[in-house]
Amino acid sequence: MGRSRHHNKLKEGIFEAEITALSHDGRGIAKVDGKTTFIPFTLPGEVVKFEYTFTKAKFDEAKVVEYVKKSSNRVNPPCEHFQICGGCSLQHMSTDAQIEHKQQTLINQLKYIGNGVEPENILPPLRTSNTEGYRNKARLGVRYVSKKGKILVGFRERNGRFLADIDKCIVLNPLVGDKITEISSFIETLSIYQHIAQLEIAIDDTRPAMIVRHLEPFTNEDLEKLRSFAQQNNYWIYLQSKGPDTIFRLYPQGDVEPKKLSYQPAAGIDIGFEPNDFTQVNNDINKKMIKRAIELLDISENDSIIDLFCGLGNFTLPISQHAKTVIGVEGEPTMVKRAKETADNNNITNVNFYAANLFESFEDKEWFNNFEYNKMLLDPPRAGAQEVCNNIEKFNVKRIVYVSCDTATLARDAGILVNNKDYKLISAGVMDMFPHTMHVESIAVFEKI
């Protein structure tokens, strides 16, 4: 016998509520008769009239009908596509208020997820001089929409189902962000325009690179068009037909100089990278972040430092200019290979790089057993560094600088270090790597008691 399914009925009418907080994705939160209601484009302290758009057992969703009381932190969004495009979530909030909110989120999560952890000092936030045009890495969806009769290029809409119809992106580097319409119009000229799925963008200190993910082969005429487009716009164009191992550079062809994209994390160091390598999205904040990490490590010429989750050596190589020795450990072997090449190309001789899965036991590894360190830098992915923190006493480091792209996992790991491993949290703060979004980069300093 089939079981009847109960459907919650949507409340009809106009209702009023005060916004008390922001959700993880930037929507306002109101409590209505004890039930959580998510209302986009609202800010804490605002009173709004709203109508329901969706209901479930544990929460409701709604849209604003009228702002009864507006927050002093409200500003006019600088982008005309803000209410539709899901690329940004906080453009209606002043940049000062964005930073304050992110800083408070870090403090709250350290306390609640970290089981009572509180930093002795709050670091002043690292700010960027330009909150627009900062983004040098992005994956842009590509889709032909027959109803619109055109190719869309950009981020998903807020509901996540479709691509947003945009003509520019103000947070992308203008070398790409100002050319969305030009790029989409160009794709329409290709024979397989309906079979291009994605553009992966990476911009170094001088030029943009674009990986074109295609599901059908290009014709020779298409390839000539791609080369011509790349030449006219000073782009490097790569093609990808399947997995990452199928990526190759279409333009420029041959043995050219420079051979790779590159950026300078610190004076005197050039890091070469491929467009699908992980690099930080915001060059300005990245340089400031590296400088702050070096200051917080309080490096002397006799220090031996280990950099875990080191990637291409973004921190490792600048740190090597100040320390006696530095060891970088990274889970992706190809990035380790490139980090070694970069050290050689920059004539840096006091670093070594190793490949290892840092989410598994590492007690049998050469880099763990054959070296001694007194300080550590951690820069893990969103999953955090739980395995490292659970075994931190085996490293016997007196100071840890932890850089995080996820405040929740930083808070969890801080709880391990402070509550279980005899470290104290000296200081913590945020760095505005991602203006106008809910994402934030954080940094924390732990010291052995």
Swiss-Prot record:
One of its GO terms (molecular function) is iron ion binding. InterPro entries: 23S_rRNA_MeTrfase_RlmD (IPR001566), MeTrfase_TrmA_AS (IPR030390), MeTrfase_TrmA_CS (IPR030391), NA-bd_OB-fold (IPR012340), SAM-dependent_MTases_sf (IPR029063), TRAM_dom (IPR002792), U5_MeTrfase_fam (IPR010280). Its EC number is 2.1.1.190. [4Fe-4S] cluster binds at residues 79, 85, 88, 169. S-adenosyl-L-methionine binds at residues 280, 309, 314, 330, 357, 379. Keywords: 4Fe-4S, Iron, Iron-sulfur, Metal-binding, Methyltransferase, rRNA processing, S-adenosyl-L-methionine, Transferase. CDD domains: AdoMet_MTases. Residues 1-66 form the TRAM domain. It holds the Pfam family TRAM. The active site is at residue 405. It catalyses: uridine(1939) in 23S rRNA + S-adenosyl-L-methionine = 5-methyluridine(1939) in 23S rRNA + S-adenosyl-L-homocysteine + H(+). One of its GO terms (biological process) is rRNA base methylation. Catalyzes the formation of 5-methyl-uridine at position 1939 (m5U1939) in 23S rRNA. Belongs to the class I-like SAM-binding methyltransferase superfamily. RNA M5U methyltransferase family. RlmD subfamily. This is 23S rRNA (uracil(1939)-C(5))-methyltransferase RlmD. It comes from Francisella tularensis subsp. novicida (strain U112).
